[in-house]
Amino acid sequence: IVVHRSAGRYICGEVTAQVNALMGRRPNPRQPPPYLTQEGLWARPTALNNVETFANVPGIILEGAAPYAALGTEKNSGTKGFCISGHVNRPGVYELPFGVTLRTLIDEHAGGILDGRAFKAVFPGGASSSCLTAEHLDLPLDFHHVAQAGSMLGSAAFMVIAEGVCMVEVALRLARFFRHESCGKCIPCRDGTYQIVRL
């Protein structure tokens, strides 16, 4: 196993950008085809998975797929690494079965909202997902239910916002983040994020 430190940019999480970085190139994504399974690292077929996928493999091999598949929901079996940050007492990564509720994730695992404040919103799939509000606190967390609620689970990088925080300021900070992190390749992202910040 080789651990390769990325350049740290947001775009570096995209799989073709990761392959470019491993080859010493600028970590910009490319449009397939060819797909990585056909032509990836050093023009060879490449299987690229995240650490969460690899972490699940030993248990499945040792115990079989049935115990893992018995966890979770009907639509999404198994577990997920829920990464929670923002206005919580115990930010961190919690491996839990799909279907755990947002309320349970925040209150029982992340220790509740900082300073006893009320929950206002959460971005369940990181900065690029739509936020969920207090009406979603009992939502089962899996790809299906979060999509039905109008957002996306994605990498399950939960950004929790407490009551008293201005959501316009949050939107401006996210716009600045995306302006800074744009690879500059396409016009909507390169120029659009600049224009959004100017507004």
Annotated model-derived regions:
Residues 99-114:
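Short amphipathic, charge-patterned alpha-helical segments
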Residues 67-75, 79, 114-124, 185-187:
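Flexible, glycine/charged-enriched surface loops at secondary-structure junctions
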Residues 21-33, 135-152:
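Active-site loop ensemble at the mouth of alpha/beta enzyme cores that anchors a bound cofactor
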Residues 1-98, 110:
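Hydrophobic alpha-helical positions that pack around
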Residues 1, 114-148:
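Terminal amphipathic helices with adjacent charged low-complexity linkers/tails
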Residues 102-105, 118, 182, 196:
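Extended, hydrophobic alpha-helical segments in both membrane/secreted and soluble proteins
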